[in-house]
Regions:
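C-terminal "cap" of GNAT-fold acetyltransferases
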Residues: 125-129, 137-138, 144-167
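Conserved GNAT acetyl-CoA-binding A-motif
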Residues: 112-124
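Conserved beta-strand in the GNAT
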Residues: 50, 56-75, 85, 90
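Short hydrophobic/aromatic beta-strand element in the GNAT-like acyltransferase core
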Residues: 46-50, 60, 88, 121, ...
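Short amphipathic alpha-helix that is part of the acyltransferase structural core
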Residues: 1-35
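Active-site rim helix/loop that mediates acceptor-substrate recognition in acyltransferases
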Residues: 24-54, 62, 68
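Conserved acetyl-CoA-binding loop-helix of GNAT-fold acetyltransferases
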Residues: 91, 97-110, 137
Length: 167
C-alpha cells in the first residue's frame, strides 16, 4: 500500500510547488495566496515536512519551532521552551485513510524528538470529532487552553489546544 512513499523535510522549492498546487486546487483563492506568503515569510521559524509517493507530494505538516513566527496566533504555552506547534496537516483527497499521513506524523515526531524538542502541541476545532479522536490516539491528551483563530478569509473559529510529551 505505502509502496514508494517516503517522508522528507521539504526544500524551499518543494514548499513553493505545494503552495502553487494548493492555490490552483482552490481556484486561485486569495486566501491560499495569503497562506503561501505567510509560510514563505516564516521559513526560519518553521520546518515543513512532506510525504512523497513516487515523487509526488501527497501529505504535509508544518512544525512551528519558534515563538518568533510572525503569523502564529495564540502562541502562549504552545511554542518555545522545548515545545513545537504542529499545523497545516494535509493529505490529498485521493490518498486519505490509507496510512500515508500517519507515517508522515511518525516521521515528524521522530525528527523533532531527535532535535531535542520535549513536547508537541496542536489545535483542533471542537466540531472536528474525527481529528480529535486521531490526536487523542496519538497521545495529544493534555488540554492546554481554548482560543480563537482567525482564518485568512475572515472566519473566526474556536480552537482547543492539546499537548503531547515526547518521551
Amino acid at each position: 500500500m505505502l509502496g514508494n512513499y517516503k517522508c522528507v523535510i521539504a526544500s524551499k522549492s518543494q514548499i513553493i510547488d505545494k503552495w502553487d498546487e494548493e492555490i490552483k486546487r482552490h481556484n486561485d483563492s486569495e486566501e491560499w495566496k495569503i497562506y503561501k506568503k505567510q509560510s514563505l515569510s516564516n521559513m526560519d521559524t518553521r520546518i515543513v515536512y512532506m510525504g512523497l509517493l513516487d515523487g509526488k507530494i501527497i501529505t504535509e505538516a508544518t512544525a512551528i519551532i519558534s515563538g518568533k513566527d510572525k503569523c502564529m496566533e495564540n502562541k502562549d504555552d504552545l511554542v518555545d521552551n522545548g515545545k513545537v506547534y504542529l499545523s497545516a496537516f494535509r493529505t490529498n483527497k485521493e490518498y486519505e485513510n490509507q496510512g500515508y499521513f500517519s507515517k508522515l506524523y511518525k516521521f515528524v515526531e521522530s525528527d523533532l524528538k531527535s532535535k531535542g524538542f520535549k513536547s508537541l502541541t496542536l489545535g483542533v476545532e471542537p466540531k472536528e470529532i474525527r481529528n480529535i479522536q486521531i490526536y487523542f490516539n496519538w497521545g495529544f491528551t493534555k488540554y492546554i487552553k481554548t482560543g480563537f483563530c482567525k482564518y485568512a478569509n475572515g472566519e473566526v473559529a474556536i480552537v482547543n489546544y492539546y499537548e503531547k510529551e515526547l518521551n
